[in-house]
């Protein structure tokens, strides 16, 4: 029987933790077995895979565990993989269908969320409730050589006991490693690329008050290249479906964390897998596989990943199942807004050791001190290492390490994601970034985001626009003034949905009241325009129905155009069964007439004349209609200015013409040809120039003073003015006294 890998991310309120009579391993103190019908689920998956209708695309899974009934409704999720997703297995590119990845919720329970994959039949997963997270995994992962009456196990996060006693920096490398990495990052031999996107953050949107990146507002997705070594492949049953399910669950976990974080106005940061390379067991003997050796230290393992060129990706990670020294679960290069290389969007560069490397990399392992860590610890480790890539060092200080506080109120909330040691994941702060991390990450995003991030193509909850898949969108909690809609800070399957009992939301359209009900029919919702009458609500929709159009050929746009099917798109000439034409330049037409609206009889260009001319006086009563400023004129050779004069367009301005005149290659070719033909003239000019310079030096040298006492004094130039001394007098005191006053600046009494 094939396997079903089901990765859940559920939100539900349950209280089944705390019973430790059935331990699973040294980390998991209690579990329950699941044994639902795998054949039935596999058939449902195959039917949903081929489904065309909306209803048939859902997969239903019902099972009972921990004292309650679970009714899952899941739909294919393509948001985690880019449209050009590429999969390599064993060195070969294979066509792969990602339709086995699902996202859904518990039927009838708002705010719940499931994310997973369905492949052939059995379940593995993660349950992430509102109050108590739970996880589902295949039983063979824990009972390899034992026959058990169930195919999956389910356990609560309250039943997970992850120790923190392994080393001062358990989970992340110690400070000496980061110091060496920082020094290496500073040794780049190439000038780091400079990114200045300050202007992208200045505009503010009209819908909700928040920062917007005007030029590239939707470039919010970091594309990933993820490799797995042969040990990771062995760990997950030697099937590519199981490996991709693991990658999917990790990416979904960090995607949820980063999307819900406001990085100083930069929001909805998401992740998408662009490429996966799976090293299978046969790659263990492949000499081209850099990860083939079993005993590789964590720093060397990261270096092997960095030695590949990852310019096509925002980040590149390697997943492994290795037990690194000192309990290290992950390692990554720390990004910075400027001054050093490394982190998101970093390009392949040359460093002091003579090697070109890509420092937009990191590594993750799922093994720690001989045991495999729970999924939630691995997910937070991934978010932690990616946080390094995004520019955040480890948290420090009282403000950002509340778990070290003496106050029990702060301490019980736990530390944040970027805490130096691994967190258990069950505390309030364990899945959040501290204010210190937010400040650091926002600076890096501001500098680098637009250099490699891409548009996600997915609806963005929180941008104030109701997009496909959203019921409403009132923005984030600090912006939402809507009592009808859940804001974007709510749980995944709750945000951007209508609150219970609410009929509509003002974010859906102008025909919804602030009381969350539809406006009465005939209430105005759109002002009238030149080509459309006033819009009125219909009483059963939040959106304003299309306005009734005015009659065709109604004048609009200051009587320069006419209405066609409710749009101001026709020429005023059409009102009189004429065609619009362009007034050409003739001796009789000045630059003002070239900016008139001109008409002609159909198929008769020679009849083209201004609306103010005698030819069309019968239609326009002698009134001259002018083009809008900026309109093309004189057969597209110019444009109309605000004074209704046709300004010819000179593609080559004076500076451009001067540049072309000086640097014209033909000019230098002509000069070269002339020199070849008249070489004797060039020779004579050279001799004359040398003689002129020699004569100048000879003549001027006799008049130039010299410090050499053996040379004669310089001769004065003819006509040089000589300084005359004043006549000597016998009144010496009277001559010196004014001089003293001038030099000292004193006044004498």
UniProtKB/Swiss-Prot annotation:
Its cofactor is Zn(2+). Residues 220-457 form the Peptidase M12B domain. The modification Phosphothreonine is found at residue 720. Residues 458-552 form the Disintegrin domain. A motif (Cysteine switch) lies at residues 170-177. Residues 19-673 are extracellular. It is found in: Membrane. It is an enzyme of class 3 (hydrolase). Keywords: Cleavage on pair of basic residues, Disulfide bond, Glycoprotein, Hydrolase, Membrane, Metal-binding, Metalloprotease, Notch signaling pathway, Phosphoprotein, Protease, SH3-binding, Signal, Transmembrane, Transmembrane helix, Zinc, Zymogen. Its EC number is 3.4.24.81. The chain crosses the membrane at residues 674-694. Controls the proteolytic processing of Notch and mediates lateral inhibition during neurogenesis. The conserved cysteine present in the cysteine-switch motif binds the catalytic zinc ion, thus inhibiting the enzyme. The dissociation of the cysteine from the zinc ion upon the activation-peptide release activates the enzyme. PANTHER family: ADAM10/ADAM17 METALLOPEPTIDASE FAMILY MEMBER, DISINTEGRIN AND METALLOPROTEINASE DOMAIN-CONTAINING PROTEIN 10. This is Disintegrin and metalloproteinase domain-containing protein 10. The gene is adam10.
């Amino acid at each position: 029987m094939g396997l079903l890998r089901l990765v859940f991310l559920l939100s539900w309120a349950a209280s089944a933790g705390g019973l430790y009579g059935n331990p699973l391993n040294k980390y998991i103190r209690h579990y329950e077995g699941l044994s639902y019908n795998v054949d039935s689920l596999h058939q449902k998956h195959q039917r949903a895979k081929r489904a065309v209708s909306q209803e048939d695309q859902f997969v239903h899974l019902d099972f009972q565990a921990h004292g309650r009934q679970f009714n899952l409704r899941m739909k294919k999720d393509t948001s985690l993989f880019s449209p050009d997703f590429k999969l390599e297995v064993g060195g070969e590119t294979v066509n792969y269908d990602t339709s086995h990845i699902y996202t859904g919720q518990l039927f009838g329970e708002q705010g719940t969320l499931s994310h997973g994959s369905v492949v052939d039949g059995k379940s593995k997963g993660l349950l992430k409730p509102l109050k108590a997270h739970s996880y589902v995994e295949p039983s063979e992962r824990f009972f390899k050589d034992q026959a058990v009456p169930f195919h999956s196990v389910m356990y609560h996060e309250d039943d997970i006991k992850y120790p923190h006693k392994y080393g001062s920096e358990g989970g992340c490398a110690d400070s000496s490693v980061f110091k060496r990495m920082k020094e290496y990052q500073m040794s780049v031999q190439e000038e780091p690329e400079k990114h200045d996107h300050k202007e992208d953050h200045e505009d503010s949107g009209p819908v909700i008050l928040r920062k917007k990146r005007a030029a590239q507002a939707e470039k919010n997705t970091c594309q990933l290249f993820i490799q797995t070594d042969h040990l990771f492949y062995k760990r997950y049953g030697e099937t590519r479906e199981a490996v991709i399910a693991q990658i999917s669950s990790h990416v979904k976990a960090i995607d949820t964390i980063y999307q819900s974080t406001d990085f100083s106005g930069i929001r909805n940061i998401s992740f998408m897998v662009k490429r996966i390379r799976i090293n299978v067991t046969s790659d263990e003997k492949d000499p081209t596989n850099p990860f083939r050796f079993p005993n590789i230290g964590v720093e060397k393992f990261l270096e092997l990943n960095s030695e590949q060129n990852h310019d096509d990706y925002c980040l590149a990670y390697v997943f492994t199942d290795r037990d690194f020294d000192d309990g290290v679960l992950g390692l990554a290069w720390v990004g910075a807004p400027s001054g050093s290389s490394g982190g998101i969007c970093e390009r392949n560069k040359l460093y002091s050791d003579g090697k070109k490397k890509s420092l937009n990399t990191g590594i993750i392992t799922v093994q720690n001190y001989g045991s495999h860590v729970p999924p939630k610890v691995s997910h937070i480790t991934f978010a932690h290492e990616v946080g390094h890539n995004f520019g955040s060092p480890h948290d420090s200080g009282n403000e950002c390490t509340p778990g070290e506080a003496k106050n029990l109120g702060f301490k019980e909330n736990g530390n944040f994601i970027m805490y130096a040691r691994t967190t258990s994941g069950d505390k309030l702060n364990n899945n959040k970034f501290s204010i210190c991390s937010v400040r650091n990450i926002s600076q890096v995003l501001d500098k680098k985001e637009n250099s490699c991030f891409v548009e996600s193509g997915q609806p963005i909850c929180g941008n104030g626009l109701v997009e496909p898949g959203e019921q409403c969108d009132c923005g984030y909690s600090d912006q939402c003034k809507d009592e009808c809609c859940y804001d974007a800070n709510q749980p995944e399957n709750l945000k951007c949905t209508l609150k219970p009992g609410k009929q509509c939301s003002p974010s859906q359209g102008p025909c919804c009241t602030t009381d969350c009900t539809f406006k009465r029919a005939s209430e105005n919702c759109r002002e009238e325009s030149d080509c459309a009458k006033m819009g009125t609500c219909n009483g059963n929709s939040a959106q304003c129905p299309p306005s009734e159009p005015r009659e065709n050929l109604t004048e609009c746009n200051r009587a320069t155009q006419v209405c066609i099917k409710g749009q101001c798109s026709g020429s005023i000439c059409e009102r009189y069964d004429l065609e619009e034409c362009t007034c050409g330049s003739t001796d009789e037409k000045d630059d003002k007439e070239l900016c008139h609206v001109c008409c002609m009889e159909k198929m008769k260009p020679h009849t083209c004349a201004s609306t103010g001319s005698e030819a069309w006086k019968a239609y326009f009563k002698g009134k001259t209609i002018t083009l809008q400023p900026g309109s093309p004129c004189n057969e597209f050779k110019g444009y109309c200015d605000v004074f209704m004069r046709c300004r010819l367009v000179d593609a080559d301005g004076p500076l451009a013409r001067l540049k072309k005149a000086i640097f014209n290659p033909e000019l230098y070719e002509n000069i070269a040809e002339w020199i070849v033909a008249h070489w004797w003239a060039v020779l004579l000019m050279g001799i004359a120039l040398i003689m002129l310079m020699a004569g100048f030096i000879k003549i001027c040298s006799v008049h130039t003073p010299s410090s050499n006492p053996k040379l004669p004094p310089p001769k004065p130039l003819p006509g040089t003015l000589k300084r005359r001394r004043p006549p000597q007098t016998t009144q010496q005191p009277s001559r010196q006294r004014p001089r003293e006053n001038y030099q000292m600046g004193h006044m004498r009494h």
